[in-house]
Amino acid sequence: MGGVHKTIERQRSSPMTSLLIAIHVLAAVLLMGPVMITVSAYQSQMMKAKDGDAKALGAATTLHRLTSQYGPISAIVLVVGIAIFLTNLSAFGSQGRFHISILLSAVAWILLIAMIIPRQKKTLAALESGSKAVDFAKEKKQLSMFGGIFNLLWIITALLMFL
């Protein structure tokens, strides 16, 4: 057993902590997985849609909808993680990896809300209206960069949980 499990074994955890950990893990799997995929897949569909592919426009629309709906809800992973941390400070408070995980999760979530979702929304609006005002090549690079950073932050966070 690794990470969180070792920490909890050292310290008797309350049923509330166990419940919060279960919610945290389920939320991470059910919410973060889809968001990580959608922020990675949107750009290629956007570029195909720019060239007139109607199916790609539908796919880009669906990917953006998933990102913009699951993304904000995914804050539950961070909120529950903080709740776990605060309900058992004696077990988690002295371990820097949990501090780092909370920080990385917050940065990833802010990146999603402030940079990724607005760019997807802007490019999708341009695709739907046929506007040529958007530099799609530049937006693809930006979305790929921010999506890659977002995914890397979550992967590092997940690894820290199992150290």
Regions found by a protein language model. Name each.
Residues 2-3:
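Residue-identity detector for glycine
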